[in-house]
């Protein structure tokens, strides 16, 4: 098994409800280690750039509006198979479909306000990490 890094974001719906500590604890309890973390409030342009892959999707405008509506906590996580492990701990995008005990089952309000975002591949992780962090900010 390989130690790898992935990107994680705690979204505005969760930061508004002061859940950053509880969510980070769930990630750490799963064996993931936070090697970089900062609180950011993205503007519309940053949200549009970060979620550019969804630009043609019908929910894009709503997503950009939501993601720029409040602070987020962006993190780099490290661990054995970190990408898959993070996705497992997050749970299904739709909290109604998420397994018991996952972040989205426990904390999400809806499919759009689903508390967290995580990279879905090594390539995406690299892109998302470098969007928010310089190498000097990642301390393993």
Swiss-Prot record:
GO CC annotations on file: cytoplasm
Active site: 117
Sequence positions that bind ATP: 11, 59, 87, 93, 104, 114
Pfam families in alphabetical order: NDK (PF00334)
EC class of the enzyme, as a word: transferase
Stated name of the protein: Nucleoside diphosphate kinase
Family to which the UniProt record says this protein belongs: Belongs to the NDK family.
GO biological process: one example: UTP biosynthetic process
Cellular localization per UniProt: Cytoplasm
Database matches in PANTHER family: NUCLEOSIDE DIPHOSPHATE KINASE (PTHR46161), NUCLEOSIDE DIPHOSPHATE KINASE DDB_G0292928-RELATED (PTHR46161:SF3)
Chief site of localization: cytoplasm
EC number: 2.7.4.6
Cofactor requirements of the protein: Mg(2+)
UniProtKB keywords: ATP-binding, Cytoplasm, Kinase, Magnesium, Metal-binding, Nucleotide metabolism, Nucleotide-binding, Phosphoprotein, Transferase
Job of this protein: Major role in the synthesis of nucleoside triphosphates other than ATP. The ATP gamma phosphate is transferred to the NDP beta phosphate via a ping-pong mechanism, using a phosphorylated active-site intermediate.
The keyword Transferase is annotated on this UniProt entry: yes
Assembly and binders: Homotetramer.
Catalytic reaction equation(s): a 2'-deoxyribonucleoside 5'-diphosphate + ATP = a 2'-deoxyribonucleoside 5'-triphosphate + ADP; a ribonucleoside 5'-diphosphate + ATP = a ribonucleoside 5'-triphosphate + ADP
UniProt xrefs under SUPFAM superfamilies: Nucleoside diphosphate kinase, NDK (SSF54919)
GO-annotated molecular function: ATP binding; metal ion binding; nucleoside diphosphate kinase activity
